[in-house]
Design a protein with these regions (language model features):
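Extracellular beta-strand-rich, repetitive "passenger/adhesive" scaffolds
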Residues: 1-167
Length: 167
């Protein structure tokens, strides 16, 4: 099933997307949380504002071409998130996830990644505290990690690669 929002959609509590659903958003969505089952897809071309969390389960796909704001971004195994504009959360926690970031991704309190693969193409990640456990980070032309307080990368666990003019 597909849900298409081209206007303003406000959900008082939790918006739930069931398995196999696709959400296309070209309007504005405001909700407490978005609860998602596996095998689901969100394509956001405008704005999603959450008071709580966006939890991306396994076999999930997110394509953000607009803006997404919330308290928590949690992504689990086999989730793929592609960010082409702005994603801003208080905390971001990613486990065995693939993230393709071409623009702005920010965690205002903390960022944690375990077993995740990041592909940055001129995008940046900003957080006061960052922790990378396992996983791979690929930084391309003009990409940047901005850890304003601390960054933790246990030796031998995370792999960082850079390419382009400023590596």
């Amino acid at each position: 099933a597909a849900l298409r929002n081209w206007g303003a959609l406000t959900v008082a509590n939790t918006m739930t997307l069931h398995s196999g659903a696709t959400l296309y958003n070209k309007g504005t969505i405001t909700s407490k949380n978005i609860s998602i089952n596996s095998n689901t897809k969100i394509v956001n071309d405008n704005k999603i504002s959450l008071e709580g969390e966006l939890n991306l389960p396994s076999n999930f796909s997110l394509e953000n071409n607009g803006e997404i704001y919330g308290e928590k971004l949690i992504a689990n195994s086999d989730a793929v998130a592609t960010n082409n504009n702005i994603m801003k959360f208080t905390t971001i926690s990613l486990t065995n996830t693939t993230v393709n970031n071409a623009c702005s991704m920010e965690a205002t309190t903390s960022f944690y990644a375990n077993g995740a693969t990041f592909n940055f193409t001129q995008g940046y990640l900003k957080a006061p505290k960052m922790e990378f456990v396992n996983g791979t980070v690929n930084l391309s032309d003009g990409s940047m990690l901005d850890a304003t307080t601390s960054i933790s990368i246990p030796p031998g666990y995370a792999k960082f690669y850079g390419k382009g003019e400023n590596t």
